[in-house]
């Protein structure tokens, strides 16, 4: 079974390895590229913990994080924790249920002023009593020029993997622009919200 992976690198390769290990035949066609933004202008001295929800954030803010080694880092997901480990940065805790649950863990550890390093397209900032969260945008996912083989790759694959709502919206737009029938395209998404973003079809 062929699955089309459209997420940006290096995440696309990591996703492809997981699907290949599960017996699928991954086809890579990234429709986005990660762009690192300037490091946060805030001082880490005002925070008692840092939250990351993406390996992209870890890579984009490497210098900033290296200057903040005394501050515990909380990571959402094993991929984020792995990216931090690859950069030789310690992880205080790794969560698997999203940023709100992880903020709750940090709060239980006594941290009440958190800095969330995130991408431009991020979920809502959690609202937890007694916890103040500032967010710093350290990267963005920029749409690439539509590949010439877009329609052909979509047609030959059995399913398209969508990792984010933005990717779902962009993919649906490209399908419509290319005259592809949505009803003939199977989608595999990481949440109901992402599926809804892809629209009807």
Task: Describe the function of each predicted region.
Residues 1-201:
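Signature of uroporphyrinogen-III synthase
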């Amino acid at each position: 079974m062929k699955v089309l992976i459209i997420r940006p690198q290096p995440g696309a390769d990591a996703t492809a390895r997981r699907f290949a290990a599960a017996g699928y035949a991954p086809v890579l066609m990234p429709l986005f590229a990660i762009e690192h933004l300037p490091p946060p202008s805030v001082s880490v001295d005002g925070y008692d913990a840092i939250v990351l929800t993406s390996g992209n954030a870890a890579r984009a803010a490497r210098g900033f994080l290296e200057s903040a080694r005394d501050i515990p880092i909380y990571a959402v997901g094993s991929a984020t924790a792995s990216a931090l480990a690859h950069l030789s940065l310690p992880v205080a805790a790794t969560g698997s249920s999203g940023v709100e649950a992880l903020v709750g863990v940090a709060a239980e550890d006594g941290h009440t002023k958190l800095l969330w390093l995130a991408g431009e397209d991020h979920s809502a900032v959690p609202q937890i009593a007694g916890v103040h969260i500032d967010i710093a945008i350290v990267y963005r996912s920029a749409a690439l020029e539509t590949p010439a083989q877009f329609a052909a790759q979509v047609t030959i694959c059995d399913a398209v993997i969508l990792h984010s709502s933005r990717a779902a919206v962009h993919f649906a737009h490209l399908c419509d622009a290319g005259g592809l029938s949505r009803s003939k395209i199977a989608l595999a998404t990481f949440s109901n919200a992402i599926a809804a973003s892809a629209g009807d079809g």
